[in-house]
Amino acid sequence: MRMRSPSLAASAATLAATAVVAMAMASCDRTRPTEPAFQRLDARLDARLIAQGRDIFRFDTFGDEKYWTDTLRMHEVIQAAVTPVAALGVGLKVDADALPAEVKAALGRGEVDLNSTATTLALLKLNAVVGIKGHVETVDGHETLVRVGITCALCHSTVDNSFAPGIGKRLDGYPNMDLDPGAIVALSPTVPEATKAILNGWGPGMYDPRINFDGQSTPLVLPPAYGLHGVAKETYTAEGPVSYWNAYVAVTQMHGQGNFSDPRIGVHIEQSPDLVTPKLPALREYQLSLEAPAPPPGSYDVAAARRGRAVFNGAARCASCHLGPLYTDVNLGRLHAPEETGMDPRYAARTSQKAYRTTPLRGLLQHPPYFHDGSAPTLDAVVGHYDRVRNLRLTDGQKRDLVEFLKTL
């Protein structure tokens, strides 16, 4: 086995494959060629593969328990200190549909001790903690967490809070912007203190998927895993299609047992048996089946949005890059240098492409903050950024209308 092994505790994050928020309104005066589109817009999806992929997305660890248990010893941390209150505090979610009716009733009556690690173990036994797989056994008469691992859903699924804050029905494909991957990994007793300081500095909804290779830290916003059908290249910097990033994250970040190789970044990992590669087609199919959510009723001004569409296609020049039904030019083989759009160049400089992809805009309202680094907290900030960088000289009214149109996508 030849393996370049990550040195920093990688994380509970970036598992799904993609990044759909890189540059909310990119310019395209200069472009770089990339490979042709990988997915046809009219490609039909396979229902059988979708069902398989859903189980993989939600419940498959790819054998990463070896890392999360044997290396990070997170099973010890959870057993000793992670109560449901603490888990919710770092953004973990509970799938209400996995809870028996009597448990829901007891929760509603306040009869469940949410400050007890025993309750956490009970939730793990029910497979109710989104993105966490735990194996609980009775050891010397005590319930004991003996193995733990993570799945794609940890970072790329949340809940609708329909039962209580942090507890509800799964929303697969939504980025868990409450999740603090750095803080979670920093709980490990095996992570050096200097590394813990870096990880604790990322904050909720942020993760760096390359720190374990180059030692730098420029964390990214966790991307959604919905609205990807027909998009040729995934990730903020368009290294490859969905399955490329799924393999990269599953092997190098989740530390699953599988193969990944990319000579462009000098990574070559071979492990036997390969528990990742055979599952990539079904996982990809499920992710491509996840549609971007429609804007909630009443979330935008209809008349203003109608005017904003004209601004989008005209004075703001957004449609020069955010074009077609997917609102991106990546399928045309275009990428954009950081200086074109006023983006921080540091992350792009660490990648093979050295440039950013134009972000598809469907479901935009549902996943702030914006840009790869989260530097724009609102759509107003996005519009303001491009008005300054591109010297658009939009009026205040045009800016407001443009924001309302973006909310409709």
Where are these regions (language model features)?
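Periplasmic c-type cytochrome electron-transfer domains
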Residues: 2-8, 23-409
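Bacterial N-terminal signal peptides
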Residues: 12-24
